[in-house]
Design a protein with these regions (language model features):
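Extended beta-strand/beta-hairpin segments
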Residues: 1-47, 58-148
Length: 148
């Protein structure tokens, strides 16, 4: 079971802010679209997708004994124009550094998208997820079809 708590902090004239605490004791600050003291909830959903797939991919690559020396993920999303503004399209770009077999990366991303990443499984219900990767410095870049 996953647990969490939200506490609302209000300051006169300064907007609204929630301090969220996970069941494991980690805290983060959320703010609304008008505030600048924390992430918006929709941003956290996108970051959760990136974190979910990143952990999957890096763990799979390590099990395949790939020499990953650096890893970044860049995410962009389009949202529905009317409320609720759910994601309609998400672009995920994986950038990996090291001596890495492109087939291993392709397989790791595929497993994340089709088996392991629960956040991706939820977001894919409303959004088309498009994934690319590149291995640097070799510069191998490939576009992957949506796994769903």
């Amino acid at each position: 079971m996953i647990e969490g708590k939200l506490r609302l902090t209000t300051v006169e004239g300064a907007g609204r802010q929630f301090v969220a605490q996970s069941g494991t004791g980690h805290a983060l600050v959320l703010d609304d679209a008008d505030g600048h003291s924390g992430a918006k909830p929709i941003e956290l959903a996108l970051l959760a997708l990136g974190g979910c797939t990143a952990f999957d991919v890096i763990n799979i690559l390590r099990k395949k004994r790939q020499k990953v020396t650096g890893y970044e993920i860049e995410l962009h999303a389009d949202q529905n124009s009317e409320p609720p503004a759910f994601f309609t399209r998400v672009e995920i770009k994986h950038r990996l550094h090291g001596q890495i077999d492109p087939e291993a990366v392709r397989a790791a991303i595929h497993l994340s998208e089709t088996k392991y990443c629960s956040v991706g499984a939820m977001i894919s219900k409303t959004a088309k997820i498009e994934t690319t990767f590149e291995i640097l410095p070799e510069g191998i870049r490939e576009t992957l079809p949506n796994a769903a």
